[in-house]
């Protein structure tokens, strides 16, 4: 067996005309098969790490076989081989499975009608909203919508509840007393797709050249590797190439397992359909109703719209929120404010649609490092590895001012390859401590290419900060720094919000979703007995009819009593009974309070009532004849006579004004005489303790009497003051009023 000796293997790192050589080793490998037993040959195995996004001539492998040893004699080969290896950008492929179509914006149509003409039954020949039919010509269940009627309380002018889409007027049974609510669909429809688990995909192209004695390079053949075909062999069996594996990307693909992909699909002439992928969206699966039975979700159907809970007491459109059109328009607003959208594809990364092996695929480009190991086994004696070192600069760079934790920070940098060769560059970032680290990026630029690089920027602090800084460094493939720029930017404090009230938001009421509807849910008004009948709620229907009959009977009775003159006397009788009962209770409470006040406030010495004697007399009421014993205690006959005279005059004064209540009693323990008189607002209490007559402060005529201004008072006050003056009563105090008998 011949022994083939290798020469040295060189790796060339070239910058224009300057080259650096690094030695490498070789390995020996034998292949043994049943067809060619013991067929051993010496191979050179080249292991390469290819980065993501490398382009033609960025990384080139040149292998030259120049000599071998035969029986100890070295022989120079006339021809050599050259291998050029390139790798396409790494992408993530997401297979799509069609789910179903969804309307962009379901709409509610409101038709004004009357109580007797609105029809929404499934067996009605011509319901107000009309029926919709499927492709087989069959009526679609619940496509007839539903009717809402003004309730009895609305017709009587007493209703104050929200009525869906209608304005109910008192005594109106004509147009506007009922409305029909119909579900209509907008012209634009979206197609939804399930998103499958991603697969990484890239291609590696290996060009094999031969170089003759005239140093002419001739293409011999091309090997094309991919994730679908990881191993290839040249036609002359001189070269074998394999993909060993790919490292996990430093920026992995987006996790789309919880989303549906939706894209405008028809009509084909719709402007949004013609926009292509820029109008596609990722929407969370929880925002959809696949059976159409849930309100305020994408895909709500006729049944979901018609069977919504308490439909007639909800605002118009209450079941048709959070639709695809709403999501799209909200993202347009965010984009107009230079903010990140929530649903459009760019919210998750850089995506495209491709056809792969006859299947519709969603493709995401990966911007981070995703190194791939490949091997090339060749019959060679010397290998040169060439890497172009570029010359580049950062022409522009900036970071916008943004709110902390808002996700709206963005770094933009323009990087240019100023060399004449395609080359690899590395961007490194060094930022202040409160800025979250930014991942370094590898760039592969063609000659004189200007590349616009951007990435998001975040800070770790909630508070505002001035002059945050980030330094951007540009390196070549072996770490030589080519350029450096420093960026200053400001951040504002985080704007905290809440949906639970106080200073940060408005409290929102919770919503309960019920799996089944009760009779009260199906019919918004208790008085709508026809609604209960149509819903099969017979018991509730009879309750409603009985209540209506009761109200009608009560109204008829009131009208009858009023017409025959009985209503006013009955009302007066009831009011009188109520007022008397309440007045009696108030006077009892007032007696107790005033007694206690007098006992605590009066401290005058007894002047004429030192000896106790008993006397009783009768007080007669004009309307009701009652007799009460009045026990008085006086120390002298003159004091007794004078006090009795004053009491009699006051009694006569009350009789003059037709008081409807008069009584007197005596508290034996405190010797307080209580006199009650004057009906309604003129009621007052007159006390006598020893030689002092007291009028409580809460008397309605106290201000007039206490100020002793009869010219401003009523006739009653003037008469009272005449009694005071005639009997030479001395005013001791006006608030409260104390009258001293002299």
Swiss-Prot record:
Claim: Flavoprotein is one of the keywords in the record: no
Membrane topology: Single-pass type I membrane protein
Domain of life: Eukaryota
Gene Ontology annotations for the cellular component aspect, listed alphabetically: cell-cell junction; plasma membrane
Disulfide feature: 30-40, 118-147, 129-182, 148-312, 150-168, 295-319, 431-470
Membrane-crossing segments per the record: 541-561
A GO molecular-function annotation: lipid binding
Cytoplasmic side stretches: 562-742
InterPro entries: HAP2/GCS1, HAP2/GCS1_dom
Gene Ontology biological process: fertilization; plasma membrane fusion; single fertilization
Extracellular topology ranges: 20-540
Sorted UniProt keywords: Cell junction, Cell membrane, Disulfide bond, Fertilization, Lipid-binding, Membrane, Signal, Transmembrane, Transmembrane helix
Record's function text: During fertilization, required for the formation of intercellular membrane pores and subsequent exchange of gametic pronuclei between cells. Probably initiates the formation of intercellular membrane pores by inserting part of its extracellular domain into the cell membrane of the adjoining cell in the mating pair. Mating requires the presence of HAP2 on at least one of the two cells. Mating efficiency is high when HAP2 is present on both cells, and is strongly reduced when HAP2 is present on only one of the two cells.
Domain notes: The region that is important for membrane fusion binds to lipids and can insert itself into lipid membranes. It is unstructured in an aqueous environment and assumes a more ordered, beta-stranded conformation in the presence of lipid membranes.
UniProt record similarity statement: Belongs to the HAP2/GCS1 family.
Protein known as: Hapless 2
Higher taxonomy: Eukaryota, Sar, Alveolata, Ciliophora, Intramacronucleata
Gene: HAP2
